[in-house]
Amino acid sequence: MRLRMELFVEDMDVSVTFYRDLLGFRVERRADDYTSLHRGLVVLGLGPVAKLPEQAAGQGFTRHLLKGARGAGVEIVLELDDLDALRALYEDCRRRAVISEPLQMRPWGLYDFRLTDPDGYYLRITHGNAAA
């Protein structure tokens, strides 16, 4: 089994720039209504909010539901094996003023920092295997 996260975004160009230029993702496929981004074993799909229905009966994503906090209750965790690479990425993010929480050693023994993407999705960038 693999995991691919799909995020609905307001501005595809802004989001692609964020994930590609800041976080180092490679654009695998790009179309008007979908972009596939890869970095290592991580696959992110970006789709425009505009392709969702405004409202719908039953469960499912709609533009109406996304008007609240994007990704509420979800933390997207990206792991780097190299602590120096984590520090360099943190400094780059800090220069661009996108940090939510600074790089620090956490009580569970791993370094990480937190940020939000242009659409408000919450990301934690960590060193090592957070699941171990």
Model features per residue range: what roles?
Residues 1-4, 26-116, 127-132:
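Vicinal oxygen chelate
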Residues 8-12, 107:
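Conserved beta-strand-loop-alpha-helix junction that forms the acyl-donor binding cleft
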